[in-house]
Regions:
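Rossmann-like adenosine-cofactor binding region
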Residues: 51-58, 172-271, 289
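N-terminal glycine-/charge-rich "phosphate-binding" loop or analogous flexible N-terminal tail
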Residues: 1-42
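Hydrophobic/small residue at the entry helix of a nucleotide-binding pocket
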Residues: 150
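Phosphate/diphosphate ligand-binding glycine-rich loop within oxidoreductases
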Residues: 8, 44-119
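Rossmann-like dinucleotide-binding domain for NAD(H)/NADP(H)
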Residues: 89-90, 223, 229-348, 368, ...
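A conserved regulatory-domain signal marking ACT and ACT-like small-molecule sensing domains
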Residues: 321-532
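Oxidoreductase and adenylate-handling cofactor-binding alpha/beta cores
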Residues: 101-120, 140, 159-163, 243, ...
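Phosphate-binding beta-alpha-beta segment of Rossmann-like dinucleotide-binding domains, i.e.
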Residues: 85, 93-141, 145, 153-161
């Protein structure tokens, strides 16, 4: 029987499942040193956010096969070390969707009707009906930033209020938006000018941090109220203070902040300049804090940990658990498929309507399900809020209106095995393809319609340009000027011979000023930075 250590409290529903299927020890409140001494006896460890599962702890876990995080975030777990040691890390990203969506709506109603402020006034003996006059939701326009699972639930609920619901999400197809019966907005500027309310449900990334800043707030309707139940920092807090101070917007309701006290901290130690504004409603990151969500989390983490221990494909944060016999053969193709998916959103930005994956050669006779899941994981991971993994990636694609098909071609002309992806976006066809050379050497042989022989690396630049002399030399000069080293370069003409693409493997990401200078080179059509 597997031995599992439960180091932090989970719901009774989860504990019951664990006790029926494994040997369970519950040791809550152990110090890090105590954990180091005892972890070697266990096959699995279950934690929440307080326990630091660092390199030292993982290396002491001689028998450790699975770490379960009862919740979404995994910042307290050293994923790199876990992956290197073959320890599966699982979490429960889908368990609190409804709770978070409902909390966003609760905050929306609170900021509209001044409920916390009126409560505070009334319990202190005041009766100020006219002072706390609110506004209705009915007939007003609300924009949802981020139409993933939580955003979609919010959209469904808000339609019942009789609101005009819009959505901003560049990575959601028009078909998906239409199915929800709402309107798609194509720019943040349009969002700010049209919205009476905004509710944010985006992932936190370089692209979304500060997505609403001073510039955007200055464009807003003066009656705008903003709700953020997603991640701290998506709304620039300094700019939000200025907007409230200057009367650019009517209010805000926030459940998340850039700097939050550690979980379990007592009241009185949270500070923010936003707390001084009467038209701001705040809560201490309560989005997932419901009985139902915690029961869901407990049940989900118990099932995930047990499934992982039994060798099944699970909701793995770091690596998929592959329950197949010949992992040595198919593993390079799994990584290749994920790379092909990553290349699309690194080089293109449009929403996807459909994806067709074709397998050619011997690989077509393998378990191709793992290959399509890997491709979709690479495709969606950079742009969705939810944790993307083998378990949920098909659902995430379906929720975004992406039609996915597979086909098999038993023979291939030039390669013993080939994985080809055809992506349709706004009626336009974009293709990528790759193969494996030797035992495990991946090669991209089709990059957005250009035939090429490219060994993918962590940092790359894809520069499409007119086929004319001097372009390559100028690009090299600019990169040298900014101390960026070119490790390899591949150049290919398109089939008509009019344009070319150069793909450079470089030793670092480039700064915005470098990219801007490259884009100004005569003949350069596009310049995309790719990080794999």
């Amino acid at each position: 029987m597997f031995k599992i250590l439960v180091a932090e409290k989970i719901a009774d529903t989860g504990m019951e499942i664990l006790k029926k299927n494994a040997d369970i020890d519950v040791k809550i409140g152990l110090s890090h040193d105590e954990l180091l001494e005892t972890i070697g006896d266990y096959d699995a460890l279950i934690v929440r956010s307080a326990t630091k599962v660092n390199k030292e702890l993982l290396e002491n876990g001689k028998n450790l096969k699975v770490v379960g995080r009862a919740g979404n975030g995994v910042d307290n777990i050293d994923l790199d070390t876990a992956t290197k040691k073959g320890i599966i890390v699982v979490n429960t990203p889908e368990s609190n969707n409804v709770s978070t969506a409902e909390h966003a709506i609760a905050l929306l109603l609170s900021v509209c009707r001044n409920i916390p402020q009126a409560y505070h006034s009334t319990v202190h003996g005041k009766w100020q009906r006219s002072h706390y006059k609110g506004v209705e939701l009915f007939g007003k326009t609300i924009t949802i930033l981020g139409l993933g699972r939580i955003g979609s639930i919010v959209a469904e609920r808000l339609k019942a209020f009789g609101m005009k619901v819009m959505a901003y999400d560049p990575y959601i197809s028009d078909e998906r938006v239409a199915k929800l019966g709402i309107k798609k907005v194509n720019s943040i500027e349009e969002v700010m000018k049209l919205s009476d309310f905004i509710t944010i449900h985006l992932p936190k990334s370089e692209e979304t941090i500060g997505i609403i800043g001073e510039k955007e707030l200055s464009m807003a309707k003066r009656n705008l109220r903003i709700v953020n139940c997603a991640r701290g920092g998506l709304v620039d807090e300094k700019a939000l203070c200025k907007a409230l101070e200057e009367g650019w917007i009517a209010g805000a309701a926030l459940d998340v902040f850039v700097n939050e006290p550690k979980e379990g901290a007592k009241g009185g130690n949270f500070e923010s300049p936003l707390l001084k504004y009467e038209n701001v409603v705040v809560t201490p990151h309560l989005g997932a804090s419901t009985v139902e969500a915690q029961n869901n989390v407990g049940t989900a983490i118990a099932n995930q940990v047990l499934a992982a221990l039994e060798g099944n494909i699970v909701d793995a944060v770091n690596l998929p658990s592959l329950n197949i016999k010949d992992t040595d053969y198919i593993a390079p193709y799994i990584r290749l498929s994920e790379t092909l998916g990553k290349l699309y959103y690194s080089s293109q930005k449009d929403a996807i309507d459909s994806v067709e994956i074709t397998y050619s050669g011997d690989i077509s006779r393998e378990q191709t399900k793992l290959l399509i899941l890997s491709f979709l994981k690479g495709l969606l991971e950079p742009v969705v809020k939810e944790r993307v993994n083998f378990v949920n990636v098909e659902l995430l694609a379906r929720n975004r209106g992406i039609k996915v098909t597979e086909s098999i071609k038993n023979q291939v002309d030039y390669y013993s095995n080939l994985i080809s992806a055809k992506i349709i976006s706004k009626g336009k066809e974009i293709t990528f393809a790759g193969t494996i050379f030797g035992k495990e050497e991946p090669r991209i042989v089709d990059f957005a319609g250009y035939e090429i022989d490219l060994a993918p690396t962590e940092y790359m630049l894809a520069i499409e340009h007119i086929n004319q002399p001097g372009v390559i030399g100028q690009i090299g000069t600019i990169l040298g000027k900014y101390n960026v080293n070119i490790e390899t370069m591949r150049v290919s003409k398109n089939r008509k011979g009019e344009n070319s693409i150069m793909i450079l493997s470089i030793d670092q990401t480039i700064q915005k000023e470098t990219a801007d200078e490259i884009k100004k080179v005569p003949g350069v059509l596009t310049a995309k930075q790719i990080k794999l």
